[in-house]
From Swiss-Prot:
This is UPF0398 protein BC_1561. SUPFAM superfamilies: MCP/YpsA-like. Gene3D superfamilies: 3.40.50.450. It holds the Pfam family YpsA. InterPro entries: YspA (IPR010697). Belongs to the UPF0398 family. Transmembrane segments: none annotated. It comes from Bacillus cereus (strain ATCC 14579 / DSM 31 / CCUG 7414 / JCM 2152 / NBRC 15305 / NCIMB 9373 / NCTC 2599 / NRRL B-3711). PANTHER family: UPF0398 PROTEIN SPR0331, UPF0398 PROTEIN YPSA. HAMAP family: UPF0398.
Amino acid sequence: MKVIAVTGYKPFELGIFKNDHPGVECIKKALHRKLITFVEDGLEWVIISGQLGVELWAAEVVFEMQVEYPDLKLAVFTPFLEQEENWKEDNREYYEFILSQADHVDSITKRKYESPEQFKLKNQFFIEKSDALLAVYDEEKPGSPKYIVESAKKKGEIENYHSYFILFSDLQDIIEEEQWNNAE
């Protein structure tokens, strides 16, 4: 596997409203654990759409990993131009920082938002251009990643395409592990 698409919930879907929320570190730790095994097996590119939440946290994880794995690259393919246009200023600044550090940035539709069709095109692009999908996603709480996860599963039924998931139970395990380590 050379290219993996990473996605997951938006912050509000997780009840997270600031990047210094303790849940963010837990999610980043889970992403790191998954990505490190893929990197050691030859992963070269992580691709995201630049969506707030899991995707931008994954970008931070990639940046941290690049210290030890300088060949690991991050690409941000936005579904449309200026997706951050209506975001709060601190979110825009955070997003622009991620874009400034990414190895490749492009827009899939190359135009501003017009319709939900642009999100479908984004999902198709990600599934076509990646070898696998990694999602912070639990089927018991579908949310925004539902459509790309469904597309990935369909591709997996007809081709050698894998979907990997970080479930809420995985995040709970990390929280308990941290509590155990801090109690010692």
